[in-house]
UniProtKB/Swiss-Prot annotation:
InterPro entries per UniProt: 4-PPantetheinyl_Trfase_dom, 4-PPantetheinyl_Trfase_dom_sf, ACPS, Ppantetheine-prot_Trfase_dom
Cofactor(s) listed in the protein's UniProt record: Mg(2+)
One GO cellular component, as annotated: cytoplasm
Protein name: Holo-[acyl-carrier-protein] synthase
Residues noted as binding Mg(2+) in the record, renumbered to the chain: D8, E57
Entry keyword annotation includes Lipid metabolism: yes
Protein keywords: Cytoplasm, Fatty acid biosynthesis, Fatty acid metabolism, Lipid biosynthesis, Lipid metabolism, Magnesium, Metal-binding, Transferase
Lineage: Bacteria, Pseudomonadati, Chlamydiota, Chlamydiia, Parachlamydiales
Pfam families in alphabetical order: ACPS (PF01648)
GO MF entries: holo-[acyl-carrier-protein] synthase activity; magnesium ion binding
Length: 122
């Protein structure tokens, strides 16, 4: 059963501008080390970072919390399986708050935008 859905879209340039302005401080605040390693080793890092940014936003929208109740950007981690499919890994805080939620995500991007959709199901 579907318990919540969320989506988000972001301009890739917005992520690029934050990296340029704030550098590692921005990256460490929003992205886990694993996310940074994956994205920064891609041909177009900002595109992949923007996809993860949108996915994190979509996940907290699906859960209905946004980034509140002590939930931070680092509580939601977007990883890829062996086939490249993105999946969500959540912190112990989110696992406790939502009794190990099942979360599915889809990420898409083009030249200017990244978008993500998340489904929380039982």
């Amino acid at each position: 059963m579907t318990l919540g859905i969320g989506n988000d879209i972001i301009e890739i340039e917005r992520i690029q501008a934050n990296i340029k302005k704030y550098g590692q401080r921005f990256l460490n605040r929003v992205f886990t080390k694993n996310e940074q390693i994956y994205c920064l080793n891609r041909k177009m890092p900002a595109l992949h970072l923007a996809g993860r940014f949108a996915a994190k936003e979509a996940v907290v929208k699906a859960l209905g919390t946004g980034f509140s109740q002590g939930i931070s950007w680092l509580d939601v981690e977007i990883l890829n399986d062996a086939n490249g499919k993105p999946y969500v890994s959540i912190s112990p805080l989110l696992t406790q708050l939502f009794a190990s939620p099942k979360l599915l995500i889809s990420i898409s991007h083009c030249h200017h935008y990244a978008t993500a959709f998340a489904v929380w199901s039982s």
